[in-house]
């Protein structure tokens, strides 16, 4: 129809429910300010978008992110939809210093007088992407014949807040 704008870049119906809930969590924990200490505005917004994607879709497959971004609200300026290649490049750009700095600041905000009980869990993930240093053959929980990566998280058992996370090569046995 004449006068109608082209809507091919974004869906005309955005799924805002989970975004509203998770946006409140970002505000309550000041995650945007905390992440802003270590990331540019663009990178912080993309990181939040990818975190939301991972939670909502229960997936971290970069090639599916653009499909998710098409019909969900985004933090990225202008709700820009980044390609899977851009997502991959972004993850490569996250340094150990940024990750450790964020964790140190996150943990510095904890109530030091409160007793905590730490739970630790690790798992492995099949990896079909090429040339990832951590991806090695090992003992996968669900063996599909591909290389795997291992990752672990330590969190406060009482409130489920993460305290520590780590990725390590797939050839190291998961013994947690």
Label each PLM-derived region with a short phrase.
Residues 1-134, 151-174:
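Dynamic "connector" segments at or just before major functional cores
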